[in-house]
């Protein structure tokens, strides 16, 4: 099975320009290819991971990746399938995001070894040297307005309005391909399926300005089995930055994917062989309640993104919280595991009697309810049941001197911080 066949078998090929020519190029020698990442935030997220890992697979097959971070295009804003104009960011902000994103990409691609080691490029390096007049003469001349208006990403914005700034985005991305082809012999661009219009603007410029052909391959935008856009948890993006989405939160995200998605996601997001995944699928189908596919998926992706130590910590937090063993975890681990539960900062003047504190912190609405809960055995302090109405929190209840975990009933957690 050649690399293109494997990508197809994993569900990673959505659309290509001349497929026969692309397969021929990939099987006959080393291809230099690029994937672009615009800095629209200070971190990449799971939505980017499909293209990143596809780029890694091609590198492992001997091809040479260029990771383009859009220091220039990030200042403009991609209109593709966005309902409204993006807010323009300052250059200092975008530069900061570029640096962080470059650091994240270095975890997935090999920038050090072999004749196909990855290279990082920033399109600000060439756009900053082009005058507006030169850009219109040397690039804009090769695009008709009819061609630019025909792009689906533009059509969807015509009725609501699109600025010239965002309208021109596609020819900036097209010029990226031309520049990388001219300087580095890059002949293939990889990106999400929503980028097809922008990407083919590159092959158009190569054809018209340099009389060369280039290839484009898009990866699918991933949805779950219900058709919902993939990569969000509770409506929020799942980030690759551990400070924005902790390894524990990412672990839980993968652990909770639906049965109908688990095996498909193993093919897309892990480097397990297709034979290994087929074997996992057999075991998974025989006992779906054990969630084997989700557990392996969570392990593989968290280890890939954050490392083995972070995976082991996420697994330990999961197991200890499930067992109610709060005291077996550090304050740092508890902050990961309980980041989404209500939090109350204890004040110096607060009464630390359990009944008083349950009301002050908002865990219950009244002292009567608090007394009932304590007497009925529904209140736990750091995993241990408290039934004494006179119980008062002390320093021994402060985990690492930082926090106390209160549980009401089986699942309602709150964190008190000091």
From Swiss-Prot:
GO cellular component assignments: cytosol
Keywords: Aminoacyl-tRNA synthetase, ATP-binding, Cytoplasm, Ligase, Nucleotide-binding, Protein biosynthesis, RNA-binding
A GO term for molecular function: ATP binding
Motif ('HIGH' region): 39-48
UniProt enzyme class: ligase
Gene3D superfamilies according to UniProt: HUPs, RNA-binding S4 domain, Tyrosyl-Transfer RNA Synthetase
Family matches, as SUPFAM superfamilies: Alpha-L RNA-binding motif, Nucleotidylyl transferase
EC number(s) recorded for this UniProt protein: 6.1.1.1
Transmembrane residue ranges: none
Superkingdom, taxonomy of origin: Bacteria
A Gene Ontology biological process term: tyrosyl-tRNA aminoacylation
Motif ('KMSKS' region): 229-233
Keyword Nucleotide-binding: yes
Cited SMART domains: S4 (SM00363)
Residues annotated as binding L-tyrosine: 34, 169, 173
Subcellular location, principal: cytoplasm
InterPro entries, per database record: aa-tRNA-synth_I_CS (IPR001412), aa-tRNA-synth_Ic (IPR002305), Rossmann-like_a/b/a_fold (IPR014729), S4_RNA-bd (IPR002942), S4_RNA-bd_sf (IPR036986), SYY-like_C (IPR054608), Tyr-tRNA-ligase (IPR002307), Tyr-tRNA-ligase_bac-type (IPR024088)
Task of the protein: Catalyzes the attachment of tyrosine to tRNA(Tyr) in a two-step reaction: tyrosine is first activated by ATP to form Tyr-AMP and then transferred to the acceptor end of tRNA(Tyr).
Family of this protein: Belongs to the class-I aminoacyl-tRNA synthetase family. TyrS type 1 subfamily.
Protein name: Tyrosine--tRNA ligase
Lineage: Bacteria, Bacillati, Bacillota, Bacilli, Lactobacillales
